[in-house]
Amino acid sequence: MEKGTLTSDWLPAYEAVPRHLFVPGVIWPGRGGMNRQDERVVRDEEPDMWWAAVYRDAPITTQWDDGAYAGAGKGKVPSSSNSMPTMVFSMLDALGVEKGHRVLEIGTGTGWNAALLSHRVGAENVVTVEVDEA
């Protein structure tokens, strides 16, 4: 990640909440700094590519067209993603939450952000909602 994005106070959450636990087996990796996706990567078919994509500082599309598309290429509109780590930690740092604060997150997505917040403030203090059943 970019220098300074992951501040020392967020390092414990980053280490305790691995991104790969919140990334499905079928993904369309993004390109760092760009809103474009590479081709589909399936963990069981290309594990090295999947792991490299998960731990690269880039967004990952996890769903297309509200789940209606499941083909080998790309759908029309990306509808769920796991955000770029530098973006996630920049936003969390700007939020300024501390242990004991209560957080309502709208848009759970893959759940990684909520898990990072839960590590920081306590799981009992985080409520997250998602309209997408997938």
Task: Enumerate the predicted regions with their spans.
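Conserved S-adenosyl-L-methionine
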Residues: 107
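Conserved SAM-binding motif I beta-strand of class I
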Residues: 125-130
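Class I SAM-dependent transferase core
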Residues: 1-104, 113, 119-120
